[in-house]
Amino acid sequence: MSEKHPGPLVVEGKLSDAERMKLESNYLRGTIAEDLNDGLTGGFKGDNFLLIRFHGMYQQDDRDIRAERAAQKLEPRHAMLLRCRLPGGVITTTQWQAIDKFAADNTIYGSIRLTNRQTFQFHGILKKNVKPVHQMLHSVGLDALATANDMNRNVLCTSNPYESQLHAEAYEWAKKISEHLLPRTRAYAEIWLDQEKVATTDEEPILGQTYLPRKFKTTVVIPPQNDIDLHANDMNFVAIAENGKLVGFNLLVGGGLSIEHGNKKTYARTASEFGYLPLEHTLAVAEAVVTTQRDWGNRTDRKNAKTKYTLERVGLETFKAEVERRAGIKFEPIRPYEFTGRGDRIGWVKGIDDKWHLTLFIENGRILDYPGRPLKTGLLEIAKIHQGEFRITANQNLIIASVPESQKAKIETLARDHGLMNAVKPQRENSMACVSFPTCPLAMAEAERFLPSFTDKVEAILEKHGIPDEHIVMRVTGCPNGCGRAMLAEIGLVGKAPGRYNLHLGGNRIGSRIPRMYKENIAEPDILASLDELIGRWAKEREAGEGFGDFTVRAGIIRPVLDPARDFWE
């Protein structure tokens, strides 16, 4: 990254309308409480439509029936998505039983959706059930605060089931960072939990009155697993251990995957190394990164507002020096670390504490009772007897964690009886999609509903070329916002229009390289034809242990993205 021509620390100009909305919202209250009582519409009006995002919700509608309802002169079938705050993806079995019941009784779709940010979402919550869902979460010690919009989102933590002590320490830091960076406004408690209004002035010492310029994502990662995809995130703490004990973190800043089709001022970017810090400085450094982005991030153009753009504009050394100044530290040199993979190890793994951990593959993270595979019922039955916890992974899977030897057989029987341990090939285990249609308002093409059958066809290509047990990290995202993390895949499909995608190639298995667009706006037959040819070449020409993405770069099929701000669109 060039340091020769750093830009201004603050972007001058007319602020975006989102900044007006936040300023006028009275610390995120708006008129949400009044809007809740408006029975004339199933949605939220005006600024409240956006303000509810700070409370963990998005207003959506069923796009499959949107045109039909419009023809009948009806408003869209409004319903909310709610995303829980769940640092590190850890959820107790008591909490699981509560969310299972709510999904069954109070949502249109009856499902629980595990996300690749280690939490769960409810889709299809009608307006009348919005307040009850927040109260249900509160009753079991959960909330949805700051899981959307311009705040520090759900903090991820490697779902490492092997080194229990290290995971426990890293998870505690993920929780501490999450709590430290939460908004201080009482709006959430007043609106959803009926807590009394206190006659004090709200203050936001870290986030400020207008919060952050854009969404902000944080991870705690334990090498050698990069399961949380650190390069998709603004701020990353890479755990450094000595003798199995956590001693500090390497800090990487400025990753992010969202782009806009055709807008060359937007690009996906991997995170940059800042340095090493001892544990005692973790919260001060986290706060310093967030407040620097708060003050320097672009508030005039939301498409250019994320930390990755701030870092490129002001220069890495300038941003790093400001973080050091605010935190009162000097970063030490980066300590050695290495990533070897991103996938979850499906099946049983024994931890060093002699407890067992069962990782269940959940295709696309969608937990529902399917014909012949009652996944939702199976997990409920396991939750009723399991003494440990569940962990949601960043690959949208679920770990039944800390199972004693005496419970192992019983839990396995329940899992098998409910279709939770059906064997799948490595390719399916390493494929992922965002939700997209029918609920996401931004979706341009199918993703979750498209991926299973598309994976069948890719598996057939692998079989045809004699490598049925190989895998390629493959991801589909329904729009360029990139929730499916296709911009860190070996094969990335980015929705362009119904049935059409941009095909990106050249990422790698460990998730440290951005893939480049190979073909634009193509349909499934063209995608499969390209993959058939390239996978055939990979099978014949690859070097020992060479992944598909690395092969496409070495063979000159695609040029690697080396400096995204300058060469992503070339």
Swiss-Prot record:
Pathway: Sulfur metabolism; hydrogen sulfide biosynthesis; hydrogen sulfide from sulfite (NADPH route): step 1/1. One of its GO terms (biological process) is hydrogen sulfide biosynthetic process. Its cofactor is siroheme; [4Fe-4S] cluster. One of its GO terms (molecular function) is metal ion binding. [4Fe-4S] cluster binds at residues 434, 440, 479, 483. InterPro entries: CysI, NiRdtase/SiRdtase_haem-b_fer, Nit/Sulf_reduc_fer-like_dom_sf, NO2/SO3_Rdtase_4Fe4S_dom, NO2/SO3_Rdtase_4Fe4S_prot, NO2/SO3_Rdtase_4Fe4S_sf, NO2/SO3_Rdtase_FeS/sirohaem_BS. It catalyses: hydrogen sulfide + 3 NADP(+) + 3 H2O = sulfite + 3 NADPH + 4 H(+). GO terms for cellular component: sulfite reductase complex (NADPH). Siroheme binds at residue 483. Keywords: 4Fe-4S, Amino-acid biosynthesis, Cysteine biosynthesis, Heme, Iron, Iron-sulfur, Metal-binding, NADP, Oxidoreductase. Binds 1 siroheme per subunit. Its EC number is 1.8.1.2. Component of the sulfite reductase complex that catalyzes the 6-electron reduction of sulfite to sulfide. This is one of several activities required for the biosynthesis of L-cysteine from sulfate. Belongs to the nitrite and sulfite reductase 4Fe-4S domain family. Alpha(8)-beta(8). The alpha component is a flavoprotein, the beta component is a hemoprotein. This is Sulfite reductase [NADPH] hemoprotein beta-component. It comes from Salmonella typhimurium (strain LT2 / SGSC1412 / ATCC 700720).
